[in-house]
Design a protein with these regions (language model features):
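Short, solvent-exposed secondary-structure junction/capping segments
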Residues: 107-127
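N-terminal export and membrane-targeting signals
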Residues: 1-3
């Protein structure tokens, strides 16, 4: 009996639940959802910049001679009207009158340092700045309404037969130079040919320079146009210095 009880107890121990243990529940593991791969970032297209049209190049004056030439001694060489120096003078002058900006003509205007060598007066630098250049600038602005911006230059007629050598002692000068009066600037505007004069060109070291455009002298600080005419006009007259 003792053995059977022991066996029975052993059987109960083998198959029975531990005292105090609650009912067991079998839970099947849940299937986990696999994470979706992150969508690849699509780069935004870079906007194409709007290209603005480049501004037209600004016009530029051209040199008649190196600036250093103004401080060198005068020469007796008679200038011509077919070389690059004269073509640059005309380029600068026409640019000045069609824009109304006299500064474009400064490389083509008789240099201040050369003027100081030429004139036998007390203060040639002051005279150049306050009379010679200022009057030329006024004359350029007076010509501007006649030609406008759209006029087309046809030719510049320089009466070489009137060119003279102005000797030292004449016209308050201490050294000489070549002078030619009454060149004609012939242009076309609106299909009509017109012209005006350049009162005086003078030389420095074999090149022509502008010096008086509208008049040699005036009674008031106003711009003057020299002999504006329909058609090509007539060069000259001779004289002056």
């Amino acid at each position: 009996m003792a053995l059977l009880a022991a066996g029975a107890l052993a059987g109960c121990a083998a198959t029975g639940k531990a005292p105090g243990a609650g009912p067991t529940t079998s839970v099947a593991p849940r299937a986990t959802k696999s994470a979706r791969p992150a969508a690849a970032a699509i780069p935004k297209p870079t906007p194409t910049p709007t290209l603005k049209p480049a501004p037209p190049p600004r016009p530029a004056a051209l040199l008649v001679a190196p600036p250093s030439a103004a401080a060198l001694p005068q020469t007796p060489t008679l200038p011509n009207t077919t070389d690059t120096a004269f073509k640059n003078l005309i380029h600068d002058f026409w640019l000045a009158v069609t824009t109304g900006n006299p500064d474009y003509a400064k490389p083509a205007f008789f240099p201040e340092k050369a003027y100081q060598q030429v004139k036998a007066i007390s203060d040639p630098a002051y005279d150049w700045q306050t009379r010679l250049w200022d009057e030329f600038a006024l004359d350029v602005k007076a010509v501007r309404p006649l030609v406008g911006r759209d006029a087309r230059l046809l030719k510049v007629v320089v009466p070489g037969q009137y060119a003279i050598w102005v000797p030292p002692g004449a016209c308050y000068n201490k050294i000489g130079y070549w002078h030619v009066p009454g060149a004609r600037v012939v242009y076309e505007r609106g299909g009509v040919t017109r012209s005006f004069g350049i009162t005086s060109l003078i030389s420095w070291r074999g090149d022509w320079y502008l010096v008086h455009l509208g008049a040699y002298s005036r009674n008031a600080p106003v711009g003057i146009v020299d002999d504006p005419q329909p058609g090509p006009g007539v060069p000259g007259p001779p004289g002056g210095c």
